Amino acid sequence: MAVWLLRANMKQLDWIAVDWGTSSLRIWGLGADNQQVFYLASDEGMASMHDAQTFETTLLKHVAAYLPADKSIPVLCCGMVGAKQGWHDVGYQVLPCNPLTHQSPLRVPDTDPRLKVWILPGLSQQSPADVMRGEETQIAGLLSKLSAAKPFDGMICLPGTHSKWAQVETGEVIQFATFLTGELFALLGQQSVLRFSVSDSEWCEDTFVSAVKEAYANPAQLSHLVFSVRAADVLAQPQGKHGKARLSGLLIGLELAGAKGLASTKQVQLVGNDDLTKLYQTAMTALGLAVVVQSGDDLVLLGLQSAYQQILE
């Protein structure tokens, strides 16, 4: 277990925002003006919790020192904490919908009188069947940021182990699609014959971009193209030295080909903070898409702040 207290000050605590994923936990203590009182990050994600009580115990371990004794502090959570295996299963809102409604933050059971806990539900789509949990809060944050003048219309991409593409019209998510790109990369790179050609390979951006374009133009050939990563290495061809870049480019190119049918615009709001987001930006730019990069961390907090206003109202 690792815990990092990144910031703290002595402002009065008004409420707590929590982003609780599968492998990580982030906690913001906020004042009445949403200024930070404290910020904590930990690797105590849902996967390390044993039962519902463990969630509350873990949260209290980190925030008890900041809690007043004479009142209950609202706590608003998003992410896998609301899954069946989480603190409390809060289900999904069904599309089409605004990712935040007056009914969306759901009160959940807690036992400590110093806390009042709400969790945001995910989003679901009936046909084709799809679900998201956690990303809806980033989408809500983005809509809050971009919809000051008029409701947002456009496409949002959220890269990750399971990448999400969401189509928004007049402030509502009308459809989305999940792509298993990150998980496929891990499985192929670590548990298939490709592992011998990927693990120690050199990175090459030109190889990555070329692979993106190749898979985008020929998505039906992906299985063949993926094996060529191994073949090029065995035959000692130049691109064989860049197996990781080629495999990554092929899989992201396939995803972009699949997302092409969803997009009603050539501009994409790309949400993220890490190197993976930069790869998606490179790939989209190479294919002629206009990309606007948005901070995923900032949008999570902005989405939680927007949801908290729903509770106050």
Enumerate the language-model features and the residues they cover.
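Short glycine-aspartate micro-motif
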Residues: W15-D19, P74-L76, G154-L158, Q269
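Short glycine-rich, Thr/Ser-proximal phosphate-binding strand/loop in the N-terminal lobe
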Residues: W15-T54, Q294
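Glycine-rich phosphate-binding loops at beta-strand->alpha-helix junctions
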Residues: S24, T265-A283
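N-terminal phosphate-binding loop and adjacent alpha-helix
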Residues: Q36-I73, G82-Q85, D89, L194-S197
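Glycine-rich phosphate-binding loop plus the immediately following alpha-helix
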Residues: A47, L123-N218
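Short beta-strand-loop/turn "lid" adjacent to the catalytic site in phosphate-handling enzymes
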Residues: P68-A129, T170
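Adenine-nucleotide phosphate-binding core of ATP-dependent small-molecule kinases
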Residues: A215-G258
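Glycine-rich phosphate-binding/hydrolytic loop that grips phosphoryl groups
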Residues: L250, V292-E313
